UniProtKB/Swiss-Prot annotation:
Segments traversing the membrane: 8-28, 325-345, 355-375, 421-441, 458-478, 497-517
Subunit structure: Interacts with the Sec translocase complex via SecD. Specifically interacts with transmembrane segments of nascent integral membrane proteins during membrane integration.
Subcellular location: Cell inner membrane
HAMAP family: YidC_type1 (MF_01810)
Name of this protein: Membrane protein insertase YidC
Lineage, top ranks: Bacteria, Pseudomonadati, Myxococcota, Myxococcia, Myxococcales
Region annotation Disordered: where it falls in the sequence: 31-69
Organism: Anaeromyxobacter dehalogenans (strain 2CP-C)
Keywords per UniProt: Cell inner membrane, Cell membrane, Chaperone, Membrane, Protein transport, Transmembrane, Transmembrane helix, Transport
Main function: Required for the insertion and/or proper folding and/or complex formation of integral membrane proteins into the membrane. Involved in integration of membrane proteins that insert both dependently and independently of the Sec translocase complex, as well as at least some lipoproteins. Aids folding of multispanning membrane proteins.
Length: 545
């Protein structure tokens, strides 16, 4: 490779590496957005329907305000939901199975997709103030946690009755038999005229929680309210302060995004508005679906999905639900490629029954696909290696005159029809695969907590740093086998600094990506050794011919 071209490649790789390292070691909090238009400037809709003068009182009496809490558990496919009489809502939803566990202090617990704090309503509670004229209207709406009565229950369903503002409300939760799914039927009666009721999905996250950087994924407990309107999926930042925000259009679902998981409510038909408000404490907020109530009554069928972000499952719901998978700023560019890699790895994992082995086989497949190009590249590198004696003579001839020496080296390459950029090709071809695999590891729940050898989770970094060190050693060997630049200082940097710097970066990235790069390095070394052995008997080009 020509000296100038090596400098360009080295500068590019180091720049990307420094950016990756900075983002991984110093993950930033989510930056604040510009303050939205205060909801006070938006015309508020009519209040919830009130009974007409002289109309009969609703048949459903309100429970005493100090009624003790009752809970009911429903076991669904892959989850256990705990429902509470406080708001007739979802108090807990724990995912089942060893895969869906997380470390909490000194023990492992099941992942719970309900994240609320004191004073917040529970998910799927109803509010008489869905348009959020002020944060206190709904984020701390006492009516949203008002006690309801359990009027019916069995092994697969529970029905609550109570009041929402001036409306009588009947809510029935049912286990559908589908993975991670509940059905919620709502019946509102006893009003007059037109109004609006909100279906709430609150969330809470400690304010000091880091969101991750461009190249570093968010922690497992990083949560954000999310809404889908038309073709836009908007995630709301719980860390910042500001007035309520409105998402207008055909709102098809709303809920809470939690890295590899999503909990969302999907109405049978799109509604007109999703509103997000912060409070009652910092780090807390709620997304509300505004449901029109016409003529003082409304029946509503809702689907609740709370589980892993499996791409095929989310696509099965339609409504753009697969956009719940957030590929991030950089990874989004490689999203299609990442999905392709994931499908290949799924196929391989179905055969070998281990995701680590599937990544190794993926590495082999990619090498086979790229073999024609990498073979030509290594041929070019071997031709450059044969010219090393001539390059040494030029170094002795021109001494410290680097400009003349570099010019003479380039003329030597041209004379023997050697492409100095050929050695860059293997790395350049692999970089899109690296980014796509990184995107797959950060967004694909299939790989979450999947073990390989000493690693318990391929989506997390190697806890013992064995793979990064092995990868660094293999990178050093690769550099030793590559033709060295004529510039001694540059040669030392390529030989020592580059593998060392790359090793430091790999300390903090998912173990699955480090495994891929390490195996790819080993295959490159083997291929290079075989080619060198095959071409060792070939005559060295003469400078004067």
């Amino acid at each position: 490779m020509g000296p100038d071209n090596r400098r360009i490649l080295l500068a590019t790789v180091l720049s990307v590496g420094i950016l990756i390292l900075w983002q991984v070691i110093f993950p930033k909090k989510t930056p604040p957005k510009p303050a939205p238009t205060p909801a006070a400037e938006v015309a508020k809709p009519a209040a919830p329907a009130a009974p007409a003068p002289g109309a009969a009182a609703p048949a459903v009496p309100a429970p005493p305000p100090d009624a003790p809490e009752e809970t009911v558990k429903l076991a669904g496919k892959g989850f256990e939901a705990t429902l509470t009489t406080y708001g007739g809502a979802l108090k807990s939803l724990q995912l089942e199975g060893d895969k869906f566990r997380k470390q909490e202090k000194d023990r492992e617990v099941q992942i719970d997709l309900v994240h609320v704090t004191a004073g917040q309503p529970y998910p799927l509670s109803l509010s008489a103030s869905p348009e959020l004229g002020g944060a206190a209207d709904v984020t701390a709406d006492p009516g949203a946690r008002a006690p309801m009565r359990i009027v019916a229950k069995d092994a697969s369903s529970v029905t609550f009755e109570g009041r929402v503002g001036n409306l009588a409300a009947r809510k029935t939760f049912r286990v559908t038999g589908k993975p991670y799914e509940l059905a919620l039927d709502v019946e509102l009666t006893g009003g007059a005229g037109n109004g609006t009721v909100g279906v709430l999905y609150p969330a809470f996250m400690p304010p000091d929680t880091k969101s991750g950087g461009i190249f570093s994924g968010p922690p497992l407990d990083f949560v954000r309210p999310v809404c889908r309107a038309g073709t836009t999926t908007e995630r709301f930042d719980l860390a910042k302060e500001g007035a309520p925000e409105k998402l207008e259009g055909q709102v098809s679902w709303a809920g809470v995004d939690q890295h590899y998981f999503v909990a969302a409510v999907l109405p049978a038909e799109p509604v007109g508005t999703c509103t997000f408000a912060r409070g009652p404490v910092k780090g807390a907020g709620v997304a509300a679906l505004a449901i029109p109530v016409e003529g003082g009554a409304r029946k509503l069928s809702l689907t609740v999905y709370a589980g892993p972000k499996d791409l095929d499952t989310l696509r099965g719901y339609g409504r753009g639900f697969e956009s719940a998978i957030d590929y991030g700023a950089v990874a989004k560019f490689f999203a299609l490629f990442a999905r392709g890699l994931l499908y290949v790895m799924r196929w391989l994992e179905a055969i070998v029954r281990n995701w680590g082995v599937a990544i190794i086989l993926l590495t082999v497949l990619v090498r086979l696909v790229l073999f024609p190009l990498t073979y030509k590249s290594m041929q070019s590198m071997n031709e450059m290696r044969k010219l090393q004696p001539e390059i040494e003579k030029l170094k002795a001839k021109f001494g410290d005159d680097r400009e003349k020496m570099n010019l003479a080296v380039m003329q030597l390459y041209q004379k023997h029809k050697v492409n100095p950029l050929g050695g860059c090709l293997p790395m350049l071809l692999q970089m899109p695969v690296w980014f796509a695999l990184y995107a797959a590891l950060q967004t694909s729940v299939e790989l979450y907590r999947e073990p390989f050898l000493w690693m318990k989770d391929l989506t997390a970094h190697d806890p013992y740093f064995i793979l990064p060190i092995a990868m660094g050693i293999s990178s050093f060997v690769m550099q030793k086998l590559s033709p060295q630049p004529a510039d001694n200082a540059q040669a030392k940097m390529m030989l020592y600094f580059f593998p060392g710097f790359f090793t430091v970066i790999m300390l903090f990235v998912p173990g699955g990506l480090t495994l891929y790069i390490f195996v790819n390095n080993l295959l490159s070394i083997v291929q290079q050794q075989l080619m060198m052995k095959h071409q060792r008997a070939a005559p060295t080009p003469a400078a004067g011919k």
